[in-house]
Design a protein with these regions (language model features):
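Short low-complexity stretches enriched in small and charged residues
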Residues: 4-8, 73-76, 143, 161-166
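Glycine-centered flexibility motif
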Residues: 2, 23, 51, 57, ...
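A cross-family signal for N-terminal binding/gating loops and helix N-caps
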Residues: 1-59, 202-206, 211-246
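Basic, nucleic-acid-binding surfaces and adjacent catalytic neighborhoods in DNA/RNA-processing proteins
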Residues: 25, 91-246
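Phosphate/anion-contacting hairpin/loop surfaces
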Residues: 15-126, 131-134, 138, 143-144
Length: 246
């Protein structure tokens, strides 16, 4: 259900788990306990444990009784892989925000997070800062196709990697991603260095050459320090680097 993992038990409650950034599920031998685990669910053939690394502890567990209570946890966004092109376009244009914000808003689109929104936008060759109101029909169609293709391909790939086993070593930074988690590395399409926008605990990655016409989007963490001196294009950035190296 969106970004939540839902477990239902016959005659019992529903467990809705949101892993956030650092939460992880592990399958352990039956009855095994760990001081790091914050939840144990014992089964005849093993124990499902929930852990969370880091200090912010944002992972969430809701235990609810009945499907009606479970539905109350649903933010209401449409399922991207089930939506038609027309439905996708209607929801996309419902509010005028940046594409990054709209794609990751659970009230609009269910289950798209930071990593896959980066991959979708790169595949669509659209800027994460582009406003939905300024997209033409061709760009909306391209974004729809990129969303469908990206999510379907990664779903198939991750299922194949798990090969029927419980998935371990889960991470948002995966080999084979085009831009997410690849700051400073070459774009697989054009070879330009992948750029980033940092804010809070998240980082948006994009290719300026493929997605923004060469324009650099201000990295909030650095632009506060550099103020008006922030380079605006890839060319300005390269000139800045060369001057620092000389």
């Amino acid at each position: 259900m969106g970004k939540r993992i839902v477990l239902g038990f016959e005659g019992g409650p529903w467990f809705a788990i949101h892993l956030m950034i650092a939460g992880r599920l592990h399958w352990r031998p039956a009855g095994e306990r760990s001081k790091k685990a914050i939840l144990f669910l014992d089964f005849d053939n093993g124990t499902l444990t929930l852990t969370e690394a880091g200090s912010k502890k944002r992972a969430a567990l809701h235990v609810v009784d009945g499907e009606r209570a479970l539905r109350a946890l649903d933010a209401g966004g449409i399922e991207p892989l089930e939506a038609t092109g027309a439905e996708f376009a209607t929801v996309l244009r419902r509010e005028n925000h940046t594409l990054k914000r709209v794609l990751t808003d659970p009230h609009l689109f269910s289950g798209i997070g930071n990593a896959y929104s980066d991959e979708i936008l790169h595949r669509a060759r659209l800027s994460p800062a582009a406003l939905t109101s300024r997209l033409d029909d061709a760009e909306v169609s391209r974004l729809y196709q990129a969303t469908q293709g990206t999510l379907a391909e990664w779903t198939t790939r991750l299922r194949a990697e798990a090969a029927g086993k419980f998935p371990e070593n889960v991470t948002a930074f995966r080999e084979g991603m085009a831009v997410h988690g690849r700051y400073g590395k070459p774009c697989p399409l054009c070879g330009a260095k992948v750029q980033r926008i940092r804010y809070a605990d998240n980082e948006t990655n994009y290719c300026a050459a493929c997605q923004t016409g060469g324009k650099l989007l201000a990295d909030r963490a650095l632009s506060r320090l550099l103020r008006q001196d922030w380079p605006r294009t890839l060319e300005e950035l390269e000139l800045r680097r060369k001057s620092l190296d000389s």
